From Swiss-Prot:
It comes from the Bacteria. Disulfide bonds: none annotated. A motif ('HIGH' region) lies at residues 12-22. It comes from Limosilactobacillus fermentum (strain NBRC 3956 / LMG 18251). The keyword Lipid metabolism does not apply. One of its GO terms (molecular function) is zinc ion binding. The gene is gltX. Keywords: Aminoacyl-tRNA synthetase, ATP-binding, Cytoplasm, Ligase, Nucleotide-binding, Protein biosynthesis. PROSITE patterns: AA_TRNA_LIGASE_I (PS00178). It catalyses: tRNA(Glu) + L-glutamate + ATP = L-glutamyl-tRNA(Glu) + AMP + diphosphate. Its EC number is 6.1.1.17. Belongs to the class-I aminoacyl-tRNA synthetase family. Glutamate--tRNA ligase type 1 subfamily. This is Glutamate--tRNA ligase. ATP binds at K262.
Length: 498
């Protein structure tokens, strides 16, 4: 590895599925690595055994692949700096825990959760910021040893705490936020680096892993800023170089103005949910990258390769990024328009199957008919599930005519136009869009009705809608039999209402 090689990582916890915020972290690290011809590493931080879910890791990796991300090292690929799961690195962490203890920079703490809670409550009552108070204050080494042995005899299990240097000031030049500074006293006292079950805490394990995996830059969310001084303290204690840090802005709900929270049910927040709705991965990438990063110029639609080429971490925003679902829908619609009919049909197929609009083993003719329906409406939809409402009328028959549509049928010429068109459809040996268009033009010529007064009654009679894609194509896909049935129904209604 060259001295200046860029190495970044995305390190998810398998405690849940891929969240929008975490997907953004993965994307920004990926873009930085690929733009700088560096390495992108996946590491699974699975030390929180109580919260890990069974398919958490698989789900994370599967959704990253769906987004088009590839990585150079990881739990599924291996690499020179593995293992890439923290649960498989416990012996490595234990080695460095012992090194810190041997240096007097870490120690065993036997305070119970109840004692710690009582300490916090007393501090709050005294209007102090809650912090850990050294439990061995004023004790000699022999007294400390005796106290620890007594705790062991009671069956208490210790945590290991890192001894924070009291007068230290932790400073770094953040790649996003600029100069940052924390005084040691603001950290909250000596913090835990190993839990009672022997597992390392996040702040300890991440330092060991990032150093041994030669991570050069750490891009992560703004909520990790307060972790940085703790991690810097461990780097310094072990005599290691600190990587460069960049903390990305918060994502807020544009409707509430509040930080996007996993508990906020008003917003879909997991990549899996957008996949299920039939969003395109390229659109999700595009939308997420624009949450806190801005390209030069007015254009907003770019492929992942284009983002890699133009990426500049200096254009990461310090201000919160607004999550706007309508903006996502607009971006996805742009990609729907750019995609081929086959690509959109592939994405829409699960939605059509779930809605019972087609069978998995449907004959080739019906498959092609459905593909053409999807092609007809692909410019109209924001995401694939919306195709269901557009296709349903062609399979199950149109919905009832709206009051708006009924008002359009009050024109005196409506019945004349529909009857004339019905006669021409009935006379067709083969009905396609070209023939339908010719028939409409023939009706215009014979009835002298044109424009909206010609097209609107025909659209409403066949589709029961006042707007939609090209009418000849729609009529072709309804087919001659259904089209005649719809026209006859409308003629009967209009004659009855005369």
């Amino acid at each position: 590895m060259s001295k200046n090689e860029i190495r970044v990582r995305y390190a998810p916890s398998p405690t849940g599925h891929l969240h929008i915020g975490n997907a953004r972290t993965a994307l920004f690290n990926y873009l930085f690595a690929r733009h700088n011809h560096g390495k992108f590493i996946i590491r699974i931080e699975d030390t929180d055994t109580k919260r890990n879910i069974a398919d958490g890791e698989r789900s994370q990796l599967d959704n990253l692949k769906w987004m088009g991300l590839d990585w150079d090292e990881g739990p599924d690929k291996g690499g020179d700096f593995g293992p890439y799961r923290q649960s498989e690195r416990k012996d490595i962490y234990a080695q460095y825990i012992q090194e810190l203890m041997d240096k007097g920079l870490a120690y065993k703490s036997y305070m119970t959760e109840e004692e710690l809670e009582a300490q916090r409550e007393a501090q709050k009552a005294a209007h102090q910021m809650p912090h850990y108070e050294y439990e061995y204050a004023g004790m000699s080494d022999d007294q400390i040893k005796a106290a620890q042995e007594a705790a062991e005899e009671k069956g208490l299990k210790p945590v290991i705490r890192f001894r924070v240097p009291k007068d230290e000031v932790f400073e770094w030049e953040d790649l996003v936020k600029g100069p940052m500074s924390f005084e040691a006293q603001s950290i909250g006292g000596d913090f835990v680096i190993q839990k009672r079950d022997g597992m390392p805490t996040y702040n300890f394990a991440v330092v060991i892993d990032d150093h041994l995996m030669k991570i050069s830059h750490v891009f992560r969310g703004d909520d990790h800023v307060s972790n940085t001084p703790k991690q810097m303290a461990i780097y310094q204690a072990l005599g290691w170089k600190v990587p460069e840090f960049g903390h990305m802005s918060l994502i807020i709900n544009n409707e509430t103005g509040k930080k996007l929270s996993k508990r906020d049910e008003s917003v879909l927040q997991f990549i899996e949910q957008y996949r299920d709705l039939g969003y395109l991965p390229e659109a999700m990438d595009n939308f997420i990258i624009l949450l806190g990063w801005s390209p030069v110029g007015e254009d907003e639609i770019f492929s992942l390769k284009e983002f890699v080429k133009m990426y500049d971490e200096k254009r990461l925003s310090k201000s919160p990024a607004a999550f706007d679902r309508k903006k996502l829908q607009w971006i996805n619609n742009q990609y729907m328009k750019l995609s081929s009919a086959d690509e959109v049909f592939h994405v829409a197929m699960p939605q059509l199957l779930d809605a019972g609009l087609i069978e998995k083993n449907a004959n080739p003719y019906k498959m092609e008919w459905m593909r053409r329906l999807v092609e007809l409406f692909k410019r109209e939809i924001s995401y694939a599930r919306e195709i269901v409402d557009y296709v349903k009328p062609f399979v199950n028959g149109p919905e009832d005519i709206s009051e708006e549509a009924k008002a359009e049928m009050q024109e005196d010429t409506a019945l004349v136009v529909i009857k004339a068109f019905r006669d021409r459809v009935a006379a067709m040996d083969f009905m396609d869009a070209t023939g339908v268009l010719a028939a409409i033009k023939d009706v215009q010529k014979s009835t002298k009705v044109k424009g909206r007064k010609l097209w609107m009654p025909l659209r409403i009679a066949v589709t029961h809608e006042t707007h939609g894609p090209e009418l000849p194509e729609s009529i072709e896909l309804f087919g001659q039999e259904k089209t005649l049935a719809h026209l006859d129904e409308m003629i009967a209604q209009l004659e009855e209402n005369k």
